[in-house]
Regions:
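Non-catalytic connector elements of ABC transporters
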Residues: 202-314
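C-terminal boundary and immediately downstream tail of ABC-type ATPase nucleotide-binding domains
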Residues: 175-198, 226
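Residues located in well-ordered beta-strands
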Residues: 169, 181, 195, 244-246
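ABC ATPase nucleotide-binding domains
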Residues: 20, 25-181
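ABC nucleotide-binding domain signature
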Residues: 2-3, 11-19, 140
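ABC ATPase nucleotide-binding domain signature
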Residues: 8, 15-19, 24, 113, ...
Length: 314
């Protein structure tokens, strides 16, 4: 697109700061891009423009499109208000409306929800998802919020230091991360990690336990064993193959609970269980930790792991 003038790219931006005209009403803010694109400088004059037949017809078309967009965003009741008289959510919807009314080929949204409080962010996120489904317009949405990205995206591109590390569907990123940074980025709220020295051979020896991790088989170097809190379970301490852990503390999160357990190898792991079961545990209790070897990952110290499939690149 470098050779295409910005005015000819047919892109619409939505900014974090809204960038609304403070002296214009919500209606005029939404209509602004249409007025600038479809009316000449003479036709935009309040008195003379009203006398020109072509301008009258185009103004009628602009009004129709603004009101259609307003209805879609549920802004009809505030069209006559200026930005200072609008709530944060209403301002954000006006900014969305200003981008949508043009019907561009691509939307570019740069953290448009960052200035909203938590409840309003979730509500507006749902509205954006609904609008995207109804309009079907390609949208590039920049965010540092993992939950926001997963909720809104068909595909996510994860970047670190200006470099794209992985592109995939949200579920595939969570299930099959390309490297440790991607796995950490999608950790909600925790990722269990354990440094492992190589060579690995036929499995990982952790304390008195032998763990077979398919990713690690045959590795000639060390790295990091990683797994999510839901990919391990607390079992009887004498279960074969289980790591020995001791309950340090418990955090409750609604119907779930997170158990922080100190392992014999000097690491602390976090395991997700039901809140009901957590009530039967006590601090200092000795238990076994059974890691799901099919869902754990081994990340070599020299870079990306060998993923189990390459559907992320399709």
């Amino acid at each position: 697109m470098d050779a295409v003038a910005p005015k000819d790219r047919d892109l619409a931006f939505v900014f974090q700061s809204y960038a609304l005209y403070p002296h214009l009403s919500a209606y005029d803010n939404i209509a602004a891009p249409l007025i600038m694109r479809e009316l000449t400088s003479v036709e935009r004059l309040p008195v003379i423009g009203a006398l020109l037949p072509g301008a009258v017809q185009r103004n009628r078309s602009i009004d129709e499109r603004v009101r259609q967009t307003s209805a879609l965003l549920k802004l009809d009741a505030v069209l006559d208000r200026r930005p200072a008289a609008l709530s944060g959510g209403q301002r954000q919807r006006v900014a969305l409306g200003r981008a949508m009314v043009r019907k561009p080929k691509i939307f570019l949204m740069d953290e448009p929800l960052a200035n909203l409080d938590a409840a309003l962010r979730i509500h507006t996120r749902s509205e954006i998802a609904r609008l995207h489904k109804e309009m079907g317009t390609t949208t590039l949405f920049v965010t540092h919020d993992q939950a926001e990205a997963a909720a809104l995206s068909d595909r996510i591109a994860i970047m670190f230091g200006g470099e794209i590390r992985q592109v995939a569907k949200p579920a595939d990123l969570y299930r099959d991360p390309a490297d440790l940074d991607v796995a950490r980025f999608l950790a909600q709220p925790f990722l269990n990690e354990l440094a492992v020295t190589g060579p690995i051979g036929g499995g990982l020896t952790v304390g008195n336990s032998r763990i077979i991790i398919r990713d690690a088989l045959g590795s000639r170097e060390g790295g990091t064993l990683a797994f999510r809190p839901e990919h391990a379970s607390l079992v009887c301490p004498d279960q074969p193959g289980a790591l020995q852990v001791q309950v340090a503390r418990i955090e409750y999160a609604g119907t779930d609970a997170y158990v922080f357990a100190d392992a014999e190898v000097g690491a602390q792991f976090v395991i997700r269980i039901t809140a009901e079961r957590a009530q039967s545990l006590r601090g200092g209790e000795s238990l076994g930790l059974d890691i799901d070897s099919e869902k754990a990952w081994f990340f070599p110290s020299n870079g990306s792991r060998q993923r189990r499939d390459h559907s992320w690149a399709a």
